Each structure stands twice: as structure tokens, then as C-alpha cells.
Amino acid sequence: MEIALVPLENGGAMTVRGGDEARAGCGQATGGELQCPPTAGLSDGPKEPAPKGRGAQRDADSGVRPLPPLPDPGVRPLPPLPEELPRPRRPPPEDEEEEGDPGLGTVEDQALGTASLHHQRVHINISGLRFETQLGTLAQFPNTLLGDPAKRLRYFDPLRNEYFFDRNRPSFDGILYYYQSGGRLRRPVNVSLDVFADEIRFYQLGDEAMERFREDEGFIKEEEKPLPRNEFQRQVWLIFEYPESSGSARAIAIVSVLVILISIITFCLETLPEFRDERELLRHPPAPHQPPAPAPGANGSGVMAPPSGPTVAPLLPRTLADPFFIVETTCVIWFTFELLVRFFACPSKAGFSRNIMNIIDVVAIFPYFITLGTELAEQQPGGGGGGQNGQQAMSLAILRVIRLVRVFRIFKLSRHSKGLQILGKTLQASMRELGLLIFFLFIGVILFSSAVYFAEADNQGTHFSSIPDAFWWAVVTMTTVGYGDMRPITVGGKIVGSLCAIAGVLTIALPVPVIVSNFNYFYHRETDHEEPAVLKEEQGTQSQGPGLDRGVQRKVSGSRGSFCKAGGTLENADSARRGSCPLEKCNVKAKSNVDLRRSLYALCLDTSRETDL
């Protein structure tokens, strides 16, 4: 049964029971209303409502009963104790984890809070220029300086509620666009290459961003060549393959260049008439049936020539005693030794065999052994040493062609000559333009040789007997050489010749600027590699000896290991800014006429240097 105190309008109170009977404390109900006089001890003033219980009036007709009399006014009644509302059941710990952060409420509230946190604005001050972005934009790359809260915390200014960076202001447009675009890096037009590369490294955008930046700016990634794993083979390979690796490597390179030059000079000198006549006399002495005039003597039989057999034996020592043959043998011995040593020490035998320079080395020494075998075969009895059959003449013709291959030894100098390497790279990069040039010349030769042939056909003294015979004239005219051995005579032929010369000038002039541009690019890139090496030697930061740095020995770049040497330039540049080294030694630009791309290339190559925060 529930009991509740219900205040009345006249100041009384009644108790409502859940049953059918109710007694009024101050009166009884009349006409459905309860009438009670004022309770004793209460003023007619504002009445304070009695505290309510948990019950409610069930029925208007239910009975009431009077409350017990109130205590005296002098005694203060005790207020009724409020009943405790039932507390909600506290969820177990696993339920709390599922519900999320109690400060945010439900899981949905936590998601909304996280989303609002990502959309929170961040103020970045770059040398006084304020930028504003969102935390979610920076959080796309958490490994960068701005994306990692722990890394950027040291730059936070609590007074201004912003991050302050004393860096280049125009460069930050490209840095912020990197975050906004999701990884696209674009250099502002008013920022130099080296400055923007330094900003990329400061904000720690990573090696991948640096590689993309280098590719966008037109830098070609050099192929890294591994070194042999064996320590002895590594040292031998560095000595014979990379002349700048040590002093002994430079000495080997000097000896190799001298041997190549001696071989080329010998190849040219042995074709002089005086040396050629002497060699012919050594190889082919007078025949037995053509002796010199006999001198009178006591014994007439002394003028008889010996039989042909004994005359073959002296030819062998005479041929091997030829000075040119001795010099050639010495050079070939060195070339063979160098080739075998490099093949033994190379890290990859298959890659060594496919290298064009190694193929040239083999071709350079191959004719010697064929010539030596042929000479020895001719000296054998019954080998046709007299040279009186057609087979020997054919073999001599083949030997001349084979010995012509010796001229390719001059390309061995490209291993030690940067100029030849630049020329080779330029031709390799300009193959398309060279193909177009040859194609244009081919079309012009066909057109103008046909035109000049028909223009000169009616003239009896013409120099053009056929269209193929006019090819030579068209090539000489289009290349503006003009030997004059073949020339048009008639007016029509001269007009054709004039048009041919003009067309040749225009045809050659079109692709030449592209080839020159490629040459300039490779030339400046090679000089960029030389500058850090010179500066490194002046500073003396690293000794040039067999004990090379382990990091350099693991991977060597394709062009003199400049990738490994670029770090020295950056260290010297940092020292120059800090004032720890003389300015005349640290400032590369002040010592040589080097453009802006030199310092950038060194910065881009050294992607492993950590940025000081």
C-alpha cells in the first residue's frame, strides 16, 4: 500500500491511501472536494508545500484520513529523509572500453570528437608570414616534421598559440602544398633549386619526396654498381676500375694510359714507307733464283744460293726481332694482364662480359694473337713460307683487316678520359636526334642526286653517270664540304646544287641544338662531381689510401663514386655557415665559376644526411 502527502489549497494536508477508505485530518470531502481548516501553528502567509512522497493520487473518490497533529512550534520538525533514487548499474571494464572515452560519452561522440580534432586549425609562422591549415592535413604524413606532434612540439609558441619556424618563406608554399595535395611536390618559381632542396630536408619529407623532386627537375638517377664481397677482390677492383679511389689506382691508370698511347703510336708509325720497306725485306728476302751479281772468286760454286729450305729458318728470329713486334707484344701483355685481373675481381662476371668497354678491350688484343698464330704457321716447314701461293695472299688480306681493329684501342682511353665519357653519354642520349638527322640526309640525298642526274643527263661532259654515282656529290654538298671532284656544269644542275646546299644547312641545323644541349648537361654534371672531390682533398677530411670508408666500399656510383663524395661538400658547407673553417676553402662558388646547379646537385645526392633539429 502506498501513502502520499498531498498539500491542500487551505494549508492542510491529507494522506491518500491506495484503499477505498480515507480519513481527512481537517475536514471531509463535500461534493468531491476536500475542505480543511488551517492547521494550527502555521501562518496565513505563503505556505510551503509539504514534501512529496513517491506515491500519487490514484482516484479522486478514494478516502482520506487525517494526519497526526504537528509538533509544537517551538520544536523544529525533522525533514523527511528523501528516498535514494536507484543508481544506474556500472558497466564492467570491458563495457567501458567499448563505450569509449567517458568524457565524450558514446562511441559516436568520440568519433565526432576525433573528427573535430582533425579539423582543428593550426597556425604556422614562417619568419613572420602566418599560414593556417588543419591538423588532419598535416597528419597525412606522420613521419615528417609537421606531421609528427612530437617533432613539431619544440617549435610551438604557447604565448601566440602557433608554431614558429625561422625558415625561407616562399619555399613553404610548396611544402604546404605537399601536405594539401597528398604528396605532390612542386617548387615555387621564385625559389632556387638548392634552397628548396634544403627545405625538403629540413621538414623531413623523406627520400622518396627528394627523388621525385630530382626527377621533376630533370636530374638523372645514376645507377649504383655493387662492389665485390671479398676484401681482396674489392681492393683489386677499386685499383683497376676507379682511378680516384687511391694513390695506387692513380699509378695503375697512368701506366695504362701510357701503354695505350704507345700502342697507338706504334700502329701509326709502322705504316711509314721507310719502316714498311724494311719490314717487307725482313719478311720477304730476295728469292734464290735472283741472287745479286756474283763476285769473281776462286771457287765458282760460291755464287750458288743455298736451297730454299734453310732460308725459312732465319725468318722466324728476324720477324720476332722486329722492334714494332716487340713493342706490340709488350703492350698486348699489359692489356691481357689488366683484362684478366679485372675479370677475376669483378663483382658480376655476366655484367662484366656485357660491358661495352670490356668488349673493346677484348677486340683490341684479339688481332695480335691471330697475327702471331699466322706468322708462326707460315714459318713452319711446308707452311708456304715462301709466299708463292694464293692462299697466303688471302691470309695476308685478312690479317690486314684484322689488324685494322687495333685502332679501336684508342677507345680504351675513355676509361680514363672524362671528355670521351661525356661524348659517349651525349651520343647515347641523342640517338633519337641523330636518327632524325640521318633520316633527313637520306631523303635529301635521294632527291637531289636524282634531280642533278636528270639535269645533267643531256650534257656529254657530265660527271654524273648514274643516280648512285651522284650519291657522293649529294652527301658532300649537303654537309657543306664540297670537294669539287664532282660538280654540275649546266644551269639546271647548278640550281639543283644550290638548293641541295641550302637544304643541307637547314637539315643539319635543326637537331644540332638538342645535341649541344645534351652535351652541356653532361659536361656540367661531370664538373659538379669534380668540385666536391677537389674541395674534399683540400680539407683533408679523409685520407686517400687503400683503407677506404666502409660506406664507400659497399656501393660506388657509376661516375667516380660521386654519390659517396657528395656528403663532404655538405659538411663543408655547414662548417662554412658555422664559421668553423676558412671561407676561402668552404665557399665552392667563390673558388671556381660554378653555377647554381652545382650546389643543388650535391644537396640532392646526399639524401642520407640527417637534419639538425
Curated annotation (Swiss-Prot):
Residues 66-83, 285-295 have a biased composition (Pro residues). InterPro entries: BTB/POZ_dom, Ion_trans_dom, K_chnl_volt-dep_Kv, K_chnl_volt-dep_Kv1, K_chnl_volt-dep_Kv1.5, SKP1/BTB/POZ_sf, T1-type_BTB, VG_K_chnl. Pancreatic islets and insulinoma. Residues 1-211 are annotated as: Tetramerization domain. Changing R184P: Found in a patient with pulmonary arterial hypertension; uncertain significance; significant reduction in channel activity; affects processing resulting in reduced abundance of the mature glycosylated protein. Its main location: membrane. GO terms for cellular component: cell surface; Golgi apparatus; intercalated disc; intracellular canaliculus; membrane; membrane raft; perinuclear region of cytoplasm; plasma membrane. Sequence repeats lie at residues 61-71, 72-82. Residues 1-247, 346-356, 417-431, 524-613 are cytoplasmic. It is a multi-pass membrane protein. A motif (Selectivity filter) lies at residues 480-485. Belongs to the potassium channel family. A (Shaker) (TC 1.A.1.2) subfamily. Kv1.5/KCNA5 sub-subfamily. Voltage-gated potassium channel that mediates transmembrane potassium transport in excitable membranes. Forms tetrameric potassium-selective channels through which potassium ions pass in accordance with their electrochemical gradient. The channel alternates between opened and closed conformations in response to the voltage difference across the membrane. This is Potassium voltage-gated channel subfamily A member 5. It comes from Homo sapiens (Human).
